[in-house]
Regions:
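N-terminal targeting/trafficking signals and adjacent low-complexity tails
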Residues: 2, 14-15, 43, 93, ...
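Glycine-rich P-loop/Walker A and Walker A-like loops and their local beta1-loop-alpha1 context
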Residues: 7-53
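Long, charge-dense
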Residues: 52, 56-97
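Short acidic, S/G/P-rich loop/turn micro-motifs used as interaction or catalytic elements
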Residues: 25-29, 56-58, 79-81, 104-108
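A short acidic, amphipathic alpha-helical/loop segment
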Residues: 35-36, 61, 85-89, 110-114
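Residues at the starts of beta-strands that form the adenosine-phosphate
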Residues: 47-48, 71, 124
Length: 131
């Protein structure tokens, strides 16, 4: 039994992956994701918040949500396969606090590879997908 009155917070969040599932075709995807990105951009310390995306992200949109772009690294990819491997590299390198990506549908092996990369880089991964 944990005594929450005396329990100490964890100094570093555990590495690993989190999935966020959005309804396909919704025009409010930006409104769901950007507040999280803004929060994470202010929590990353000396490490990057890396966002791997296929779509260009307008600078004004980032400004509207108060994203700290001085700690945000945007990486644009051409397709799901490229996004998968860029995400793996960003997770494994260890210079990102969190890597956000939408690599498309992943099989079990690909998901496990990303999990191992996050552990190797002591990094959080946020995978966004649509259903």
């Amino acid at each position: 039994v944990t005594n929450f009155n005396t329990a100490q917070p964890i100094a570093q969040p555990a590495s690993g992956l989190t999935e966020l599932v959005l309804t396909q075709g919704t025009s409010q995807s930006w409104q769901m994701v950007l507040p999280m990105i803004a929060h994470l951009s202010r929590q990353c310390g000396q490490r990057w918040l890396t966002w791997v995306t296929r779509e260009p992200v307008p600078a004004q949109l980032l400004a509207n949500f108060n994203v700290d772009t001085s700690r945000l690294r945007l990486v644009h990819c051409k397709n799901d396969e490229q996004q998968l491997w860029v995400s793996w590299d960003a997770l494994a390198l260890g210079n990102s606090h969190t890597v956000i990506a939408s690599p498309g549908k992943l099989n079990k092996r690909e998901f496990e590879q990303l999990e191992r990369a996050a552990q190797l880089g002591q990094c959080q991964g946020l995978l966004i997908r649509e259903r």
